[in-house]
Design a protein with these regions (language model features):
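Short, hydrophobic/aromatic-enriched beta-strand segments in well-ordered soluble domains
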Residues: 132-143
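A contiguous, surface-exposed recognition patch within enzymatic or periplasmic domains that forms
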Residues: 1-132
Length: 144
């Protein structure tokens, strides 16, 4: 039997700035739960750095002592980070929820006082000796 795992990239950004990730559901008329949000134990949803809109989650990097981590499923597979007059758009896979580790999340976000991480996750896969696994992400950098 092959090990079961998933590829995961950690993109680390300097303090300051704001990250926004799409959090759109599949169909607003669908009455089943389709918007996944996973919280690590120390995450406090009343943290002033976290902001929800109808279609997205935004976090503003403010160097507070408390750190947090959360994950979600982004159907559009897109996150944006703006800092120092630059905008980085990060596009990544949106595989079926059932194929993902970490409770169906394809994107995780970690913040501490010194930096912020944007973390796309690939689909769960079996990997045999001599094989490889990967996921894709595209970066697009532009001035703001």
């Amino acid at each position: 039997m092959s090990p079961d795992g998933a590829s995961w990239s950690i993109n680390t950004f300097d303090r300051g700035g704001k990250a926004t990730v799409s959090f759109v559901g599949s169909d607003r008329s669908d009455l089943n739960p389709r918007r996944i949000l996973s919280l690590w134990g120390n995450t406090n949803l009343s943290d002033p750095r976290i902001h929800f809109t109808e279609d997205s989650l935004s976090v503003t990097h403010i160097p507070l002592d408390a750190f947090f981590k959360l994950g979600l499923y982004s159907k559009t597979g897109m996150a944006v980070f703006e800092n120092k007059q630059q905008r980085l758009t990060l596009s990544f896979e949106a595989p079926p929820i059932e194929s993902l580790c970490d409770h169906g999340c394809n994107f995780e976000l970690y913040m501490c006082s010194r930096f912020l991480e944007l973390e796309p996750l690939g689909a769960r896969t079996d990997i045999a000796p001599g094989q490889c696994a990967s996921h894709w992400e595209d970066w697009y950098l532009e001035p703001v």
